[in-house]
Amino acid sequence: KVNGIVGHMDCKINGEVVDVKSASKFAFNKFQNGTLAADDPFGYLGQLAGYEEAEGTDEGGFLVINKESGELCMYTPDDLDKPNINTKINTLLDELKLDKPPELCYTPIPDGKKGNMKLPKGCSWCKYKHECHKDANDGAGLRTFKYSTGYTYLTEVVAEPKVDEVL
């Protein structure tokens, strides 16, 4: 428990917190190559930092299995790659008390080469995405398109996608 937030770690190995993850090949490579800090849409580093704070440790890591190949890796992030979890939790708790949404967590990213802009993954699963981006597409809000790989939320449509729009 950290600042009133409860979590459940997976295990400790040699006295250090270890979070066990199964990952796609793409996500597995972020752990294996040590590039998770550059793109951590699920907040894994914050999760680890929270477990470490609660346990009084600071050299934890992730034991990750590639779901496609069964390959394993152990990734121990640098301290500077982990957020100050007390500050992060306090900031989020303060933002939850606001009458209006906080600043956007993520900025839209290009979708292909024709000028369309979409929400990044970290924003796509958020239940507030429509509220945060209600002014997208010249005030019409987010436009949702169904691709074979799932839904894409466009903030700016320059070229109409050749897939079904979810209305």
Language model features with spans:
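A short acidic/basic microdomain associated with nuclease active sites
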Residues: K1-G4, D10
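A short acidic, glycine-rich active-site loop
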Residues: N33-L45
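Short, mixed charged/polar active-site loops
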Residues: G4-V6, G15-V17, G70-M74
